[in-house]
Amino acid sequence: MARAKFERKKPHVNIGTIGHVDHGKTTLTAAITMALAARGGGKGKKYAEIDSAPEEKARGITINTAHVEYETESRHYAHVDCPGHADYVKNMITGAAQMDGAILVVSGADGPMPQTKEHILLAKQVGVPNIVVFINKEDQVDDIELIELVELEVRETLQRYDFPGDEVPMIPGSALMALTALTDNPKIKPGENKWVDKIYNLMDIVDSYIPTPKRNIEKPFLMAIEDVFSITGRGTVATGRVERGVVKIGDSVEIVGLGATKITTVTGLEMFQKTLDESIAGDNVGILLRGIQKTEIQRGMVLAKPKSITPHTNFEAQVYVLNKEEGGRDTPFFSGYRPQFYVRTTDVTGKIESFCTDAGEPIKMVLPGDRIKMKAELIQPIAIERNMRFAIREGGKTVGAGVVGKILK
């Protein structure tokens, strides 16, 4: 079947929901899609369609990163619903890297919780430039002063992690009340329901506060591979978000990392089940590759313009080590420590060979809450470059978040 062509009529922005488990991220995502669908901006999605992680559905915890799309009058959005549960921060790290801005969901009934803080820190570390806050469950709070207290607390937390706490917009509302109204009447009009209007208000603020990103189109093409599958008779497709540059059908690309670098040709491009002639930075796309077997390519490798990025194992980095309250370790670690390094879409075991303070003074051990400069060696080469962000994990905990300062080997 011939695919419809994807039309670029509006600027495209990648956003997502972050925040503590059960504060209402997925409910809000569903409410946004249904509210905008009522105005003609895409198809509404029900909670169950977004929360489609069958193995965890029973516990109501979202594990897989769900992608939905919708439109406001001025923009087209791709929205990732990031996992809220601490064990699934791994997905947050690959998911949050796909955001030009985030909607931080905080329950007005509970205020900021440990994962709220962990997600704000991770958003900072993975380079989410802007945050808008939705104070959810307003219908469960009788006293307006409690909402104001929650706002104050969220602003202080944002400030602590270098977001402009004073200017970040805060919108109170109830995702569940809005979703219930939209489920009862999918054609509801603006002005007919105060809870639905708060969702429109939120999206107006997202439109105006989160700047249309300046895409890295001028830079050489790079896409981190998230998934790989075969299409019978056509070949192997790699999917992911184009991090920078432009790729066209017929271009040569290199497959870099986790093995010998290979070169191949792009024979097809698809986005949201529609074909493209070219794909640009910011697109979530499937790339059909000539002559590549599914076994030769895997999540964690990157597709890149030939000779633009090389695989490395040794680097120096600035790292913030999470304290116990942020979900990190409660004991120190020493040189020779071997955690997992999460880079773009991959995790690789590495060894922390040595470290010193930010100022360069030698230290014997690293305590939770420290900021350090360190040297690391990975067991497999992956595509690494200066200023690239990564996370350090161990046994389901985020131990630290860092940025590459210097490539050593």
Swiss-Prot record:
Residues 174-176 are annotated as: G5. GO terms for cellular component: mitochondrion; plastid. It catalyses: GTP + H2O = GDP + phosphate + H(+). Residues 10-214 form the tr-type G domain. Mg(2+) binds at T26. Keywords: Elongation factor, GTP-binding, Hydrolase, Magnesium, Metal-binding, Nucleotide-binding, Plastid, Protein biosynthesis. SUPFAM superfamilies: EF-Tu/eEF-1alpha/eIF2-gamma C-terminal domain, P-loop containing nucleoside triphosphate hydrolases, Translation proteins. Residues 60-64 are annotated as: G2. Pfam families: GTP_EFTU, GTP_EFTU_D2, GTP_EFTU_D3. The keyword rRNA-binding does not apply. PROSITE patterns: G_TR_1 (PS00301), G_TR_2 (PS51722). GTP hydrolase that promotes the GTP-dependent binding of aminoacyl-tRNA to the A-site of ribosomes during protein biosynthesis. PANTHER family: ELONGATION FACTOR TU, CHLOROPLASTIC, ELONGATION FACTOR TU-RELATED. This is Elongation factor Tu, plastid. The gene is tufA.
